Each structure stands twice: as C-alpha cells, then as structure tokens.
C-alpha cells in the first residue's frame, strides 16, 4: 500500500519539500539558517499577533498601550521582549544566511537569490515600521529622519514624503498606516518565502564544495530534520537568554521617553541591524548621493551573480577570495560600529573609508582576485 504522505494532494507537497526531499550529503551548519529564519518568522508573527490585540495605534495612547502590555497583560512583558529581540535574532540569521550564499556561491541560483533580496527588503521595511510603533523618542525621530530621505528624490520628493506621512509631519496618520503595514508585511514575507523555497526546490540545494551533488543525495528526513531541530534549540536558547537576562541590551534607552516633536535626541540612530547602511548613508555629504548609496548597499547583492568571474562556484578552495570575504565582514562590523557613533572626527573619515572599501571589494576586488585565481590554476 502506498504511503498516504505520497498520495494525498496536500501531504504530497509537504512530503516533497520536507520529508523525501533529496539533499546533498555534505551540508554544514551554515545551511541551518534558512530553517532558523522560518522559526524566527513564526515567532514574530505569533508574538506580534498577541501584541496587536492590546496595542493602540494612536499618538495619544501608543506609548501607554506598550507600557500597559508590559505591566498589566499576563506575560505581556515576555511577548514584547520576545518580539523586539526576536527581530534581532531574525537579522542575525538573515545576515549569516546571505553571507553563506556569498561565500559558497549560492547566488548562481539567480531566481532564488533575487527573491531572497526582495525578502531582505521586505523584512527591513517591516522592522523599520515596527520600530516606530512604541512611539518613543527614537521611534518618532527615526521615522522623521528616514522618511525624510525620500525628499531627496528630484521633483516628486517632497510630495512623496507628505503622502507617506499623511500630513506635514510624522503624526497620527503616519503611526496608523505604519501599524497597518507592519501587520500586513509579514504575511507578504511568508508568501515570498514560499516562492523562495519553490525556486530552491527547482534546482536543489548548493553544497559547501560548489560541485554538483546529484550522485550523492540523502533524504531530508531524518538527517536534516534532526540537524534543524538542534539549530532551533540553540537559537531559542540564545533568544530566551537575551529576553530573560538583558532584554534591553540591543535597544535604545531614548525609546523609553515618550515621543516629543519639540525635543530632538542627541544622537538619532536606527536599531543595530541597520547601522551599517546608516553609516554608508551618513558618509556621503550629498543627500541624494547618500540615499542612492544606502539603497545600493543592499541592491548591490543583485549584481553579485554577474560579477562572478571564478571557474569555481564556492570559495572553499579559493584562499585569496576567502581573505577578501573576511575583509568584507570586518568592513561591515566597522560600519555597524560607526553608524552608532556621533558625526565627528575621527568617525567621519573611518566611515567614509569603510564605505569606499565595501563597494570596492564587491565591485572590483572580488572579480579581479577571481580572475587571478583562475590564472594561477591555469584555467
């Protein structure tokens, strides 16, 4: 008798995606982050749903409703901090997932890669709007500064900003629409995730060697299901530790002050996971130039497949490219640090140097070093 999981119309899809899926036998722990991102998304949607039951998106009551959740709702403090720190875990997993793709050449699956870039933008937009909702000082001023960047767009910029604000400044209309979009976007992200997986399963997974693994495949279950479960336990332990011991470690103390349009905080900065892009934005003195650099800092991922000059897919056997990759990681850490510092000497010049290096490594040095490696291997 044929197993029901192979014949039932719905179970058949689940079976071919998570049970009988042929997977390369050599996948390392770097391949765990896709499933971890799925868990993060699930945690964020669930905690967000319960928070939305008690939150009010009105400038007069938003800050107090968050206080009410933390003080009066059963385990409301836990929901709030799981949601806030869950976003941090989400971005840690996201950046490691993208880094894995860059290192092992997974970007050669261009459809999967491009949907991934769309996902990155969607998650960043969701996180930005979520940061505005508690209506603290950094929420208000962060929203003001970032939405104002759109005014750099020639001709339509000012109208566009006022259209997004729903008035002449960040106010009640802005908060209400940001809440609506913050609620909606995670479901769009979920749909995009399904498309991402659909394209991935068309080609099959890459592996650390970058060599086709068709002759050596193993079923996803039980080998990788058990491996993923271990990953879940490690990540959820890290999240629980963060939430229960130092929930405000990654937040900004200014956000515990209710939003006040008449008082600007000394240093306006976004959450830590946007600091690298914020540093690139600030390192260019021209407003439009800064906005273009900000967008390009993420959009540059879309042209990485075109810049792939190596005859080998993965960096596993390319020591020169590995050195450049880890230099890029160091540059990103430097940019993240600079994004949180005030705009003064020597931070300005460090930020500008790191920004130039970031684009230089991806656009010129990596393709050039790949050609050098090809030559050294006489390919």
Swiss-Prot record:
GO terms for molecular function: metal ion binding; ubiquinol-cytochrome-c reductase activity. A ubiquinone binds at residue 201. It is a multi-pass membrane protein. Heme b b562 binds at residues 83, 182. GO terms for cellular component: mitochondrial inner membrane; respiratory chain complex III. The gene is MT-CYB. Belongs to the cytochrome b family. This is Cytochrome b. CDD domains: cytochrome_b_C (cd00290), Cytochrome_b_N (cd00284). Heme 1 (or BL or b562) is low-potential and absorbs at about 562 nm, and heme 2 (or BH or b566) is high-potential and absorbs at about 566 nm. The lineage of its organism: Eukaryota, Metazoa, Chordata, Craniata, Vertebrata. It comes from Artibeus planirostris. The cytochrome bc1 complex contains 11 subunits: 3 respiratory subunits (MT-CYB, CYC1 and UQCRFS1), 2 core proteins (UQCRC1 and UQCRC2) and 6 low-molecular weight proteins (UQCRH/QCR6, UQCRB/QCR7, UQCRQ/QCR8, UQCR10/QCR9, UQCR11/QCR10 and a cleavage product of UQCRFS1). This cytochrome bc1 complex then forms a dimer. The chain crosses the membrane at residues 33-53, 77-98, 113-133, 178-198, 226-246, 288-308, 320-340, 347-367. The keyword Transmembrane applies. Its cofactor is heme b. Keywords: Electron transport, Heme, Iron, Membrane, Metal-binding, Mitochondrion, Mitochondrion inner membrane, Respiratory chain, Transmembrane, Transmembrane helix, Transport, Ubiquinone.
């Amino acid at each position: 008798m044929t197993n029901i999981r192979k014949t039932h119309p719905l179970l058949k899809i689940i079976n071919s995606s998570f049970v009988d899926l042929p997977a390369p036998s050599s996948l390392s722990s770097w391949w765990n982050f896709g499933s971890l991102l799925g868990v993060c998304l699930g945690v964020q949607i669930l905690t967000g749903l319960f928070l939305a039951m008690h939150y009010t998106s009105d400038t007069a009551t938003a800050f107090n409703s968050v206080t009410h959740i933390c003080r009066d709702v059963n385990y409301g403090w836990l929901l709030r901090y799981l949601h806030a720190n869950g976003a941090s875990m989400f971005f840690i997993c996201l950046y490691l997932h993208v880094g894995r793709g860059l290192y092992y050449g997974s970007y050669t699956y261009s459809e999967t890669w491009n949907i991934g870039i769309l996902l990155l933008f969607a998650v960043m937009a969701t996180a930005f709007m979520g940061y505005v909702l508690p209506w603290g000082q950094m929420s208000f001023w962060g929203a003001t500064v970032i939405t104002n960047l759109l005014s750099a767009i020639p001709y339509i910029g000012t109208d566009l900003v006022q259209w997004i604000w729903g008035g002449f400044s960040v106010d009640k209309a802005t908060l209400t629409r940001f809440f609506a979009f913050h609620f909606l976007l995670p479901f769009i992200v979920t749909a995009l995730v399904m498309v991402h997986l659909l394209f991935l399963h068309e080609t099959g997974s890459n592996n650390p060697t970058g060599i086709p693994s068709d002759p050596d495949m193993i079923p996803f279950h039980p080998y990788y299901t058990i491996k993923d479960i271990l990953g879940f336990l490690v990540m959820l332990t890290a999240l629980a530790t963060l939430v229960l011991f130092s929930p405000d470690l990654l937040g900004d103390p200014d956000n515990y002050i209710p939003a006040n349009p008449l008082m600007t905080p000394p240093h306006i900065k976004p959450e830590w996971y946007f600091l690298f892009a914020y540093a690139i934005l600030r390192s260019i003195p021209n407003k439009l130039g800064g906005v273009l650099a900000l967008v390009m800092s993420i959009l540059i991922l879309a042209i990485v497949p075109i810049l792939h000059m190596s005859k080998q897919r993965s960096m596993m056997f390319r020591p020169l490219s590995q050195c450049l990759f880890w230099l890029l990681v160091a540059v990103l850490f430097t940019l993240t640090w600079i994004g949180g510092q005030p705009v003064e000497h020597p931070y300005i010049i460090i930020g500008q140097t790191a920004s130039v290096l970031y684009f230089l490594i991806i656009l010129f040095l990596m393709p050039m070093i790949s050609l050098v490696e090809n030559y050294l291997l006489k390919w």
